[in-house]
Amino acid sequence: MKRLLTLLTLALLLLTLGTTAAQESCTAILGCDPTLRGLPDEVMAAYPEPNVIQLPIDDSLIYDRLYRKVTAPTQVFDAPGGSPISDHGGGFSYVTVNSIAGDWTQIDTNQWIPSNVLSDDVLISRYAGIRLPAEPLPYPVAWIMRHLNPAAEPGADPSDFNPFLYRYTKVNLYTYVEIDGFRWYQIGPEQWVHQFNVAKMTPIQRPAEVETHKWVGIDLYEQTLIAYEGETPVFATLISSGLEKWPTNEGLFNVYLRFERTTMSGAFQQEDFYSLQEVPWTMYFDGDIALHGTYWHDGFGYRHSHGCVNMSITDAHWLYDWSRDELDRSVPDDKDLSVYVYSSGQYNP
């Protein structure tokens, strides 16, 4: 009997310790349950999905050009079967298809390359960001970053009983608990995801140094961008910033040069050579670092670039059009869109 009482006492002590840990990490939003169950179902049912407006997809904008990857070094000719005029070094290179004549592809005026060094047409991302309501959102909004089934409880394996969520699905983050130093977010009744599986949108206060009415905040940790009018967030999306070798610099900048289409290239005769024709909706803000549309990948939410801030074509067009009236050239020393780059957490590559 004495041994049984000892075991019962030990079990109760362990349960108390576990509950205490949950109480400390639970955010207690609208009655969070500290037993790792999260918010009551009826509370989440009042806000079953984010109250945001999906940016519409304009196929005529996305597919107005054909892009192909250059898969091997080649020469550029002045006509199909004509004379070589330059070398194309391969590397990370994409071109615009202007026309096709037999086994030749025109990539610019009087510039042709053999079609056999080109990939099939590039599949352009149809991802797009969200417009935000005037009133504050009741819960943080996030995007699911990989296809998954949520776990039934924090720290558990994916549950086949939960719905399958596709990458880029938008979810509310109702609350969280911390396990082993990492957050597990509740996104629905008995639905939990690890913090590495979401990209969270968190509006910030306007930095005192921002002088323009319209500005954007770029969070390198979450890989998100939020556009603001004054203090009010109006738009949010996923981006891809620079890789560790080519980081996007933190700080406050202003757009100083805009192009609806421009060619980007660099690292000539090096392993990381790149050449990208007709990069859409480009806004330079920090030397040769720019915000721009991206037709060559669909990896938004992850670092991917040589320093630029990659956006989907839909998002880049929206941002370019929304901010084009910020600079008043009739006003001396007026400034274009402010770009505030920061990190909300510590990135560990």
Where do the PLM segments sit?
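Bacterial N-terminal signal peptides that target proteins for export
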Residues: 1-8
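Bacterial N-terminal signal peptides
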Residues: 8-16
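Exported/periplasmic cell-wall-interacting domains
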Residues: 23, 209-211, 235, 243, ...
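Boundary regions of SH3-family modules and the immediately adjacent low-complexity/disordered segments
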Residues: 23-64, 108-142, 186-215
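SH3/SH3-like beta-barrel superfamily modules
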Residues: 24-32, 82-119, 163-199
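Short, solvent-exposed interaction modules
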Residues: 78, 129-174
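Solvent-exposed, polar/charged alpha-helical surfaces in well-ordered, non-transmembrane soluble domains
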Residues: 87-90, 163, 223, 314-321
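Cell wall/extracellular polymer interaction/catalysis modules
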Residues: 157-249
